[in-house]
Structure formats: C-alpha cells, structure tokens
Amino acid sequence: MGIKISTGEPGGHNYLKPELIKDIVSKLNGTIVENCTAYGGKRQRLEDHLKCVEDHGFTKIAKVDILDSEGEFSIPTKTGSIHLREDIVGSHLENYDSILMLSHFKGHMMGGFGGALKNMSIGVASTKGKLNIHSAGAENQEQEYVWSHLPAQDDFLESMAEACSAVMDYYDNKGGIVYINVINNLSVDCDCDSNPEEPCMKDIGIVASLDPVAIDRASLDLIYKSNDPGREHFLERVETRHGAHTIEHAVTLGLGTTFYEMVSIDK
C-alpha cells in the first residue's frame, strides 16, 4: 500500500511527523509515497528531495518512494472536466494497488486550505503534473511561465478537483483509496512553505472517510464550529482564496458528497 503524505519543505515544521504516523504506517506495512515539487526549493530535484526525506526522519519508519523519480504517465480526467483532459502522475503510482491519502489539514497560500483533495491532486501529480494543474491546463506549461501567468483562481481550484477525478477513476479499477485528515498544527500556510506562519489554532483531531469530498467538508466545518480565537485568521485565508470552491467542483464532478454523518470514536 502507498501512503501519500507531504514530506514537508525544509525549513517548515508543521508537516505530519514520523513519530505521529509511524504506527499506522507500520500496521499497514506501507510505503510512504510522494512526488517532486514544481517551485524550486529543496524538493524539486530528486537528490534534494531524498535528503529532505531522510532529514525529516521518514526513512526511519518506512520505505519511501518518490513516484516521479523515473518518469510519469497520464491518466484521463472525468467527463465533465472543464480545464484538464489529463492528470500527469509519477510512473511508480502503477506499483500500488491501493492508497492511504494521509493528509495534514491546514491552510494554503493558493488553495485556501489543503486536505485530501489537495493531497490527491497536487500531491499525486508529478512536477509536470503540478504545472498542468497550477496553469489550469494552459498550453504553455514551462515552469517560469506558469508562475508568472497564473490562471483565474476558480480555474485553478477546479483543476485540482479535476485532477482528483483522474486519480479516483484510476483507483476505482484497483484497490481503492482511504482518506485520513489530521487537523493539527493549523497554520494558514502549507507544508510546501519553507517559512510558514506559526499555527494559529489548537489541534482539533483526526477525521477518516472513504469520501474525499465529505472529509474535506467535515474538516472545514470543524474549523467553522471551533471557538478557538485563531479561527477567524485561519478562515480569512480559506475564504479570500475561495477555497471551498474546490469542494463544490468536486461535487459537480461526482467525486463525493458534502452530506455526512460524523461518528466519534473517542474513548
């Protein structure tokens, strides 16, 4: 089983720590999987990314596979997609019959928030796939061009949902995907940031589902329902980026539902 996490950009410190996830990784006998980035930093070059993985302690708890280390392949997006005809993913993805999408739920500079949908779209995409999503499928996907010619915000958010549709359809024919969101270290910034803002809210908990739409909606709802004094600051990041639109477009594509029942397993 592949366990998809964010390995965290060096300099950042809010990513899911090995000591937190090691038990579930061991229980599943899983391999931690990740892809290289598309914005420079210390995880775009394979050699740098492998050093990051080791420095952050992930190699001490499991095998780690950088999915696009030996190439990539394309999978079609769902009928009804507006921007993307395909999602470009790391070639090693085909080695995994099932995936645990183990996501750190937090804010995000571009997407408003990051959870299961972000991890499954940007996270599963190769470097080229990330540029495909961030450009909303634009013809010119050269890295420098993409970052200086970003699309309309909703086009980007919709492209994330469309990339998710490709990954979900791919795994419908395999062993499927399980989603876990860990709602802790609630910074407004993503784990891809080398200098993230400190968490502005207390940890909330862990949510699990077979539905990526429901889990992200439920995670976001837990923020809205919180009495934490940092709630407004976090939600400002979400709302100014129209973050919930990713969820809305995912519903339109038939990826899941925003109607859910929350079952507590607290002892």
Role assignments for model-derived ranges:
Residues 1-267:
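Extended, low-polarity segments enriched in aliphatic/aromatic residues
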